[in-house]
UniProtKB/Swiss-Prot annotation:
Transmembrane segments: none annotated. Gene3D superfamilies: 3.30.70.60. GO terms for molecular function: small ribosomal subunit rRNA binding; structural constituent of ribosome. Coiled coil: none annotated. The gene is rpsF. Keywords: Ribonucleoprotein, Ribosomal protein, RNA-binding, rRNA-binding. Pfam families: Ribosomal_S6 (PF01250). One of its GO terms (cellular component) is cytosolic small ribosomal subunit. This is Small ribosomal subunit protein bS6.
Amino acid sequence: MRHYEIVFMVHPDQSEQVPAMIERYTASVKEAGGQVHRLEDWGRRQLAYPINKLHKAHYVLMNVEAPQSVIDELETNFRYNDAVLRNLIVHTKAAVTEASPMVKAKESKVAEAVAEVESEEAGE
């Protein structure tokens, strides 16, 4: 089995359906004997340029190890699902399990905010 990185963008009005979509896609990978090495829900983000007159989309990143048949099935699901605006499936050499730069940046911002609040409380 090969390793893949999958990113898909969902219509912002369909954000409540994202957990069900993630569950469905991960279940299809696991049923075929594959593994999900990393799953990140990046949430609603600003697009670099409008797509179908939309300026925001809900982003999801998955790193999976799966047979080609599952990847073909996912591509078909993405293509015929109107809620999925764009998708990208890239073959990788090895499993990626570390946090993405998007998540690391978010965690560092949270850590800075916590440190700032703690320093303000200590100063009072």
